[in-house]
Amino acid sequence: MIKYLIGIQVATALYLQFFQADEIFAPTLVLIHIIAGILVPIVYYGKSDIQNNKNQPVIITFVFALATGIGLMVAGVTGFGQLILGFHIISSLIFIIFAFQFLTFDFIKFILVTGALFIIVVIAGVKDWSAIDQENKIANFSPSPGSTQSGNYIKANKINRSARCGTSGCHPDIYQQWSQSAHRFSSFNNPFYKASVDYLLSTSDTTTVRWCGSCHDPVMLYSGLMVGTPDVDLPEAHAGITCEICHGIIDIPDITGNANYVLDSPIEYPFSHSKGMLAAVNRMLIRTKPEAHRKAMLQPLHKSETFCATCHKVSLDVPINHYKWLRGQDEYDAWQASGVSYNAVAAFYNPPQSLTCQSCHMAMEKSNDRGNDYQKVFGHFFPAANTALPSLTDLKNSEWINRTTRFLQDDRINIDIFGAIIDSELIAPLGDRLQVKPGQQVRFEVIVRTKKIGHTFPGGTIDSNEPWLEIVGTNQNGETFFSSGSIQPDKHVDPSAHFFRGVLLDGDGEFILKRNPHEWRTTLYNNSIPPGSADVIHYTWVVPSDFEEEINLIAKVNYRKFNRSITIHSLDELIDLPVVEMAKDAIVISRLEKTELANNAGMRYNDYGIAMLRQNNLEASRLAFENVTKLIPGYADGYVNMARVLIKEGKFNAAKFQLDKALDLKNNFPKAKYFLALISKITGDYKEAISLFKFVRETYPNDRAMLKDFGQTQYFAENWIDASLIYNDVLRIDPEDAETHYNLMLIHQKLGDIGQAKYHSEKYLKYKPDEQARSISQTARLRFPHANNEAQQVHSHQLIQTDWFSTLK
């Protein structure tokens, strides 16, 4: 008997050590190995010849092997457990050698038995043990594009077990982090989401909620609890995005977002759903053979940015809005097409190294959780901008609010009271003081630049998020002289303020203020700022004729998670959401003291030039970049930025001159080569343009803007096949690019491929904007003067002396 037990021990140990067992077979072998190990001493000491034998070495080695085995059951094989595993293997080998000397069985027969057992184990390992116990019912998730591996629903108790990950002794830190995240409260435990769904259900049919469910209520959706109107009182309706959902995603078919992923039921170790002693056995099996668990729960796709895109890239289509395809929030494409990803050759700014979503939103946190790397794990707080959830009465969590505040204030945004235009003259870059005279009209130039942000500012749902610019002028007693963007007594922000947001309109020209995107038809304006870019906001002020004292001019970028209208609509128990001051700048306005200008302000000029270029004020932009090249002559981007303006002005030779200067500073600078390629394309030198684009493409193969320029150049050169290949590369990056589908339609018409031309024509018509919707915007412009002002590409905000302060004079 004992030879068979030792044979089982050896066979299972060899397989576990040298073969990659799947997620079910591995823990099963571990369990067999442990049971055999427990039986060995029982049988061993039951033999009379052993009882009479006083061999100390065999007893010592066996006790050591048993002790280290028990140690592995307790500690697992991670960290210090690796050392225990080494001792366990060595002591077990020595025990077997000694056992041969004192046990009466045939060595050859033992080898044959062990070999046979090993072969049986190997054959068993080939079997597909990944079959899972799912409800035998074909699922219908439409209009969500999400799916399950089997095509069936998954039992809720298989994908709603986050607490087990935290209480099993394996991932308590990660579980606590997740418990304080928006992912935890994505479902009907989030009153803002619940109010949105309630309104959706009251204005549409019940199937539309499944479109929301794939990202917000995956436990409900994939377990079949969203077939009709969801029961929001079920525990599953409050599950959030669980561990098993994110880590159960095994494939992302494309990058169109909307939760277009494939979910698999988690592969479970034996006794996974047991309690008491058997639950302890389950935890022990995971600890002693975690490789299979790790392989199943952490796949390469989980570390990719496309994994995040599946829910943070959104579109609405006819089944949802009964209108047409519209692009919703899209953090992925904003990141992909930016300098943050190192994909955009023409980016104004790049971080020191490329960053992914996880770099910012899953930064490493200190932890002793099992599976930590050097006492660190990927953070699962998922910090962003949500201070609303931890402010709710039922969830009040100051630690969460403070953590989010620190994240928002971590150099994400820079604000700069750059200059003032007085009597048509720009006085800049300002230092700490500006001198004015009574009666003068002053236009302040306030620059806001995105810094440590990998997508547009703001991200997410730009219609409900509320970042804005607040300008306040106070006297030396702290009394307000003038302001723009202050919070009013009714808790709404001053409607004349400058907002960094998008205003969405429904078919009647009303603002979308109920988180009701299914009724969205067009956008009145979108004042968000791209990553690594800048905007300039203009404020006009007429200096009072009796102006005598100094004024402290303070500019702040504020952030409130939801505007007041959304809060009123969503909450039964109204609260005041926190306002986070993300960035601040200040100067003193004086009648007597002279203006102070700043030194070493080349990059401030660069930001101003970028902002003015985005507003198409080419002269102001060019003058700003001229100052950059004077103040920072070794900054190659300064000359490239000059060339950008000159190209838009049609001054191609002057632009080439600036680009040559940049190339003198940085040999083969891809950014300079790219703009030289654009000049060659515009002037009809297609051969030179193609050569330059090929050079740039070697460094930036995933730059969609560059590829579209390259493809169009090939089209102009009548290289239809080459143009087609390049444009198809663009679709690999963004399958929903309307412009690319249009150009491919033209190319296939030239090639005589009517089928492909028709295909791309249909895609173009699907993804292109609806020009007729502009009429809705015109109606809204007449009704909402402040929003109409914001919708102008270049506009200013008037600073008016407050009534109550003027009464003090």
What positions do the PLM features span?
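Membrane-embedded alpha-helical bundles that constitute the cytochrome b-like, heme-associated redox core
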Residues: 1-134
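Structural signature of tandem alpha-helical TPR/SEL1-like repeats
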Residues: 615-627, 637, 648-661, 668-671, ...
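Primarily the internal scaffold of c-type cytochrome electron-transfer domains
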Residues: 27, 127-156, 174-208, 225-531, ...
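TPR/TPR-like (Sel1-like) alpha-helical repeat modules
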Residues: 732, 738, 742-773
